[in-house]
Amino acid sequence: MSEEQHPDTGLRGMVVPVTPLQQNCSILWCTTTNKAAVIDPGGDLDNILGAVEQNGVELEKILVTHAHIDHAGGVAELAERLDLPIEGPHPEDQFWIDRIEESGSKYGINARAFEPNRWLDGHDTVTIGEQTLGVRHCPGHTPGHVIFHHAPSQLAAVGDV
């Protein structure tokens, strides 16, 4: 796990490698409120929750860049376990969400389909505590891939683009 602070921007972050593919799941939090979001919880939820606890932050939502198994395999379970809303990806990734259980079986990842509380589009914003991140729709890797950009820190959570 690695932690990064963006001075004077109100945002801190940590990367937690998850799944057999060692995908980078991110935890971002507002330093004013200690409210946090987990981005792309592909699996290994106990590791993710351990990092959340270690940093003394409170998860308020799940953000999803795209619905490939290594990025979204743990979304349904985490949302259910902690009663968290799911934001993202773009609706064009519905096909991948519908197939996530089948995809997971190929990698030994138990996954379930999920329904986002909020689909995201290219000009939306999301909040983490008092921090606002812009959303950009970046189709290519998947048709519904989105990225999250925090302008004050110049940090971008880009999934696989």
Residue ranges and their predicted role:
Residues 10, 22, 112-114, 120, ...:
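Residues that act as N-cap/strand-start positions at coil-to-secondary-structure junctions
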Residues 28, 40, 66, 78, ...:
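Divalent metal-coordination and catalytic microenvironments
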Residues 35-39, 61-64, 135-137:
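Short catalytic-loop micro-motif centered on adjacent basic/acidic residues
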Residues 102-103, 115, 125, 131-161:
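Metallo-beta-lactamase
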Residues 3-55, 147-161:
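Conserved beta-strand hairpin/beta-sheet module of binuclear metal-dependent hydrolase folds
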Residues 43-127:
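Active-site HxH/HxHxD metal-binding segment of metal-dependent hydrolases
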